A protein has these predicted regions:
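Short Lys/Arg-rich amphipathic alpha-helical segments
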Residues: 1-179
Length: 179
């Protein structure tokens, strides 16, 4: 990406963050790339984390209606500001999917209640359910072969990475039942 494109993307990101904040959303990622005679604008948004919230609370994901509303807001803003210039563009707005790696504290916090595989330097990957996540680290509840559970704590300073595991057959109602 050229310096001009990078500066434009940064300006767009700053502008979009301004319209997302009142909607209690945060800009997770923005990419502007050529797509034939047009440009493709990919925007990832997610809910703003509640200040001082309970680190064991499950945070509901964005639903399709919310994403559709946000898409209209972003499209209107891009058109108002003429940020994309004269060239046509295609706008894609979504929330981070399960394939997006968990690398920042807010990623782990948003996935309380979900099954994840955690990788820490010089350790074997561990799969368990995030039961708590705060500013310092998170707790993973791991179920052993005989059904016994243990809790393992990780600090973000330890350069941990996570990946959400898809659970077939687990109803969304069972996630966070006791919250």
């Amino acid at each position: 990406m050229s310096e001009h494109q990078s500066a434009r993307t940064e300006r767009i990101a700053t502008d979009l963050a301004g319209v997302l904040t009142p909607l209690d959303l945060v800009l997770e990622d923005l990419a502007v790339m050529p797509a034939g005679k047009r440009r493709l604008v990919r925007v990832l948004v997610d809910r703003t984390l509640p200040e001082g919230g309970d680190p064991t609370d499950v945070i509901p994901p964005l639903d399709l209606d919310h994403v559709a509303e946000v898409t209209r807001v972003i499209s209107d803003r891009l058109d108002e500001t003429d940020a994309m210039g004269e060239q046509a563009y295609v706008l894609e707005v979504s929330s981070p999917g399960t394939d997006r790696p968990l690398t920042l504290p807010r990623h782990f916090r948003r996935n309380v209640g979900r099954l994840v595989e955690v990788t820490a330097p010089e350790q074997q990957p561990v799969t368990g359910r995030i039961t708590r996540a705060d500013e310092e680290g998170f707790t993973l509840t791991v179920t052993g072969p005989k059904g016994a559970t243990t809790e393992q704590s990780y600090r973000y300073d330890d350069d941990v990475r996570g990946a959400v595991q898809i659970e077939w057959g687990r109803s969304s109602d069972s996630e966070g039942d006791d919250h």
